[in-house]
């Protein structure tokens, strides 16, 4: 995957972030969880679940592949244990902590989280990385329909005060940082531009799913600052793998 060298500046009203695979590389931990979950369930194909369920709520995966265990309280308990039992298998997506800290340092709340993980698990991942959680921290416990439904990202953008504005889209420009097909579909359905993080899937796959910018990780992204007059935060992409031509006109 070749990187470009000409920086790209993107000015937006708000940014929404997935967590697993976007802020933290938790897939090895979650894979270990699924393998342990399936040890006493002969009908449960852990490798298949690992392959197809990235970006889903754990409850939705269990409801589909082990419906007898689809109890919300039970699933919440299972997920809360993942960072504790398997946390040593997880690391930050390179540059994620620095980027999140830069967003937290802005004078106005300009970012939110919308994850398919439960509240307990997502909070523990943030504690694991030492990142202060944003005010709007949307988890599996806060939505009726998980990704690929747009509800998580709609809640994030609406909470920050930037609902879809069909009359004047320039006043409600929101980007989603995502790595997974379900989240990309959710973000697009929520009227957002998609910044694809190539941690889980490759460049061609992310292009096929409709990402507007694709980066290897967060190391090449900087927060340029906040303009109170335009109510925009600037993201500067020093390197990127791909960008749609029309993005520069957004």
From Swiss-Prot:
Residues with Phosphoserine modification: 90
Description of pH dependence: Optimum pH is 6.5.
One Pfam family here: Hydrolase
SUPFAM superfamilies, A to Z: HAD-like (SSF56784)
A cellular component term, taken from the record's GO annotations: cytoplasm
Upregulation: By osmotic stress (at protein level).
Record: active site: 18 (nucleophile), 20 (proton donor)
Cofactor (UniProt): Mg(2+)
Cross-link (Glycyl lysine isopeptide (Lys-Gly) (interchain with G-Cter in ubiquitin)): 64, 144
Superkingdom: Eukaryota
NCBIfam families on file: HAD-SF-IA-v3
Function as written in the Swiss-Prot or TrEMBL entry: Glycerol-1-phosphate phosphohydrolase involved in glycerol biosynthesis. Plays a role in osmoadaptation.
Name of protein: Glycerol-1-phosphate phosphohydrolase 2
Source organism per UniProt: Saccharomyces cerevisiae (strain ATCC 204508 / S288c)
Gene: GPP2
